[in-house]
UniProtKB/Swiss-Prot annotation:
It comes from Nepenthes x ventrata. The keyword Nucleotide-binding does not apply. The keyword Secreted applies. GO terms for cellular component: extracellular region. Keywords: Disulfide bond, Glycoprotein, Hydrolase, Protease, Secreted, Signal, Zymogen. In the proteomics field, can be used for directed protein digestion for mass spectrometric analysis. For example, can be used to study post-translational modifications in the N-terminal tails of histones. In a single digest, efficiently cleaves histones, after 'Pro-32' for histone H4 and after 'Pro-38' in histone H3, which generates the N-terminal tails 1-32 and 1-38, respectively. This generates convenient peptide lengths for retention and dispersion of modified H3 and H4 peptides and allows the simultaneous analysis of co-occurring post-translational modifications in these N-terminal tails. InterPro entries: Glutamic_endopeptidase, Neprosin, Neprosin_propep. Its EC number is 3.4.21.26. Residues 25-128 form a propeptide. This is Protein neprosin.
Amino acid sequence: MQAKFFTFVILSSVFYFNYPLAEARSIQARLANKPKGTIKTIKGDDGEVVDCVDIYKQPAFDHPLLKNHTLQMQPSSYASKVGEYNKLEQPWHKNGECPKGSIPIRRQVITGLPVVKKQFPNLKFAPPSANTNHQYAVIAYFYGNASLQGANATINIWEPNLKNPNGDFSLTQIWISAGSGSSLNTIEAGWQVYPGRTGDSQPRFFIYWTADGYTSTGCYDLTCPGFVQTNNYYAIGMALQPSVYGGQQYELNESIQRDPATGNWWLYLWGTVVGYWPASIYNSITNGADTVEWGGEIYDSSGTGGFHTTTQMGSGHFPTEGYGKASYVRDLQCVDTYGNVISPTANSFQGIAPAPNCYNYQFQQGSSELYLFYGGPGCQ
């Protein structure tokens, strides 16, 4: 796909916000019991409940492979691209913060609805079909010998509409992976609108992982043992401010990098260390990744293969509308074997949009970097 060349101005990337009360857009839900190790509970004005959990009693350490794990508080090194940003203030911070030695865990919401198992848009071995309930507009960068050491992404945030809020989801994320089939290992992070899982229609930051191709390992956020959080400020699952069509644009900045000393994969949000996926829970990705993917995914719970759903991806507008109207991902960067940050050119990526009349993608060259515009209104 030939890139289009133009120049545009980035709107302010200020992340402090006051989100309206979530109740008006919530589905029937109740809160789970507080997790073990809770030393303090904070309730936001929007109804959000966050438990401050002893860092050594967090869910990760219930994983059988982490019984004797030594907590790593900071990465031993990081690539030079990780920058410094203003911290995102979350609504519950108005009523307190978690003390040092604890981590904030968003109280799990129980909706009584099944959580859909994720799928992987494996462009390398088995590209997604247009006849599935998962639809994608995704690009991938392949790197031989499973030696990629990380990737970056700055993701435009939106609040897409879902045809069936009780079952559909829409997300934008970065996938870092190695292996295939039952040996597929993934590290995933981005934003998602999924009322059936979170209890409301707000875009929320999420993480995900699997060590066996989504068969029996892995989960969203901290709902199962795996990801080790070290940061006492950011609550995984936090609500994010969505962009305005033709107006203010908001972004999620994230970086995932492997620590060469320990093999742990570290997550940074807006330049701040949040925690890591331990090397010991994986098998294929312990030394590096072979693929990085960026883009959007929707799930159509109606079982029509995505062709008859109006569930939106990204902003709900096609990528041809451009900045301020179509959703984008920038900072399309990887960390190579030697720890160097590389910025692949448009022709270095493989992309796929199985239902391009519903969701599509295109590259556009900004004044200083490449942008991936993606998404769409669904199949009308």
